[in-house]
């Protein structure tokens, strides 16, 4: 593996987004669709990226019974030592913990260790695919933060590597494990919405202060806005809707069209908040403030997908699902079914006793105590470890990681070509037609 520096990779990241690509499968020996983990009573985890998000994942995974954090890696030594100290104080370090922090490629030593079953990747996006592939090639399952890939070539690289190594690549889409999302999934499964026709998904989140921060995500995330224009972060809203619609398990994303607004809000924020003469004043942002994409599935369903992290606004993932019998929309959560006495939404309250998801009934109180986006982070961690310990397939596999990440590069290609339609590859190689729903 070449020793490309982090600075060089971040520069390349700014130029790589348009690579919607014409990548094709290289073939494989066996699909990973429906493949179970080998049952394992103790799951040993190595974490790459121990900053803010990585630290939160360490806290949530280590709270699951049967988990051992055996290795930590970050380019900043103090971040590794901070997490080691936390594990020790929390009584989670009764076993040796290997530490890696020499340079940008220290992770290559972590993934080679024989005391790691699962590698968790929580780093800048440009490293996600590279690190996930390295882990799988060393015989490790990998759980990678979102988006798992930034180009269609990277999506195929994840799929091909997972199939070739027979190791799972799980995208850590925590929003699939939110209370409302899992409850609504139960209601969808019970047929309350009838035949599904439409979904709505978004990542609308005012990140201006984070993007211009001198630390954390501010050190790299703003650079994604310099030479990319599309939906840079599609999975938080899209993942739950994909589960509602059985995408990759009875239906499949088929076509996407996308358009972006002008880029104005980051410039306005910079003008008001950043001192004159600061090097950031010279940055030219390509990413539009608001991107909207439409996805059509093979079955003819339509999903509206939004992205806006640059404007003053309340947080909103939309989380909408509609069918022939009713509609649900989140933020705030409200629901309407055909035949209601009045033409107005109602709250979810009277449905909770019957349709609350079993996972939330089982670990919801502990999840809320730990926090982590309202508890969804712990439910996600608990469920993945449950699958590994019991020997069942993961809820979110490499085909989901690829399909849910693909709107990023496909939206860029559509925007760059006058909102021209873009076709989704079939990452499952036809298996979507026979797979069982989550």
From Swiss-Prot:
Residues 1-33 form the signal peptide. Binds 1 NAD(+) per subunit. The NAD(+) cannot dissociate. Its cofactor is NAD(+). Coiled coil: none annotated. Residues 408-438 are annotated as: Disordered. PROSITE patterns: TAT (PS51318). Predicted to be exported by the Tat system. The position of the signal peptide cleavage has not been experimentally proven. Keywords: Glycosidase, Hydrolase, NAD, Signal. It is an enzyme of class 3 (hydrolase). Its EC number is 3.2.1.-. The keyword Signal applies. PANTHER family: BCDNA.GH03377, GLYCOSYL HYDROLASE FAMILY 109 PROTEIN. Belongs to the Gfo/Idh/MocA family. Glycosyl hydrolase 109 subfamily. This is Glycosyl hydrolase family 109 protein. It comes from Solibacter usitatus (strain Ellin6076).
């Amino acid at each position: 593996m070449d020793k490309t520096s982090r600075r060089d990779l971040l520069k390349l990241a700014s130029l790589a987004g348009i690579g919607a690509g014409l990548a094709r499968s290289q073939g494989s020996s066996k699909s990973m669709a429906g493949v179970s983990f080998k049952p394992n009573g103790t799951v040993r985890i190595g974490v790459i990226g121990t900053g803010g998000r990585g630290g939160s994942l360490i806290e949530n995974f280590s709270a699951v019974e049967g988990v051992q954090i055996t290795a930590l890696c970050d380019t900043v030594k103090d971040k590794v030592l901070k997490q080691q100290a936390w594990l020790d104080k929390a009584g989670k370090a009764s076993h040796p913990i290997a530490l890696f922090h020499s340079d940008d490629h220290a992770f290559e030593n972590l993934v080679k260790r024989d005391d790691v079953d699962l590698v968790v990747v929580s780093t800048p996006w440009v490293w996600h695919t590279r690190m996930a592939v390295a882990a799988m090639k060393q015989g490790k399952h990998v759980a990678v933060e979102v988006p798992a890939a930034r180009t269609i070539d990277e999506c195929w690289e994840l799929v091909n590597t997972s199939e070739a190594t027979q190791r799972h690549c799980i995208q850590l889409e925590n929003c699939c494990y939110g209370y409302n999302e899992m409850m609504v999934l139960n209601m969808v499964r019970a047929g309350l919405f009838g035949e599904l026709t439409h979904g709505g998904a978004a990542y609308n989140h005012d990140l201006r202060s984070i993007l211009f921060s001198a630390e954390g995500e501010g050190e790299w995330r703003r650079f994604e806005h310099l030479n990319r224009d599309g939906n840079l972060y599609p999975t938080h809203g899209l993942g739950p809707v994909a589960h509602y619609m059985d995408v990759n398990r009875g239906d499949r994303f088929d076509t996407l069209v996308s358009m972006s607004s002008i880029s104005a809000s980051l410039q306005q924020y910079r003008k008001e908040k950043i001192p004159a003469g600061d090097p950031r004043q010279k940055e030219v942002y390509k990413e539009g403030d608001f991107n909207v994409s439409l996805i059509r599935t093979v079955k003819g369903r339509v999903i509206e997908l939004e992205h806006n992290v640059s404007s003053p606004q309340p947080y909103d993932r939309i989380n909408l699902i509609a069918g022939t019998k009713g509609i649900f929309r989140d933020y705030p959560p409200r629901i309407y079914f055909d035949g209601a006495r009045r033409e107005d939404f109602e709250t979810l309250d009277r449905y909770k006793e019957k349709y609350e998801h079993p996972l939330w009934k089982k670990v919801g109180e502990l999840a809320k105590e730990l926090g982590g986006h309202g508890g969804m982070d712990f439910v996600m961690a608990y469920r993945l470890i449950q699958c590994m310990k019991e020997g069942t397939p993961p809820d979110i596999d490499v085909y989901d990681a690829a399909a849910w990440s693909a709107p990023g590069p496909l939206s860029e290609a559509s925007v760059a070509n006058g909102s021209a339609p873009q076709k989704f590859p079939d990452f499952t190689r036809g298996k979507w037609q026979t797979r069982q729903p989550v």
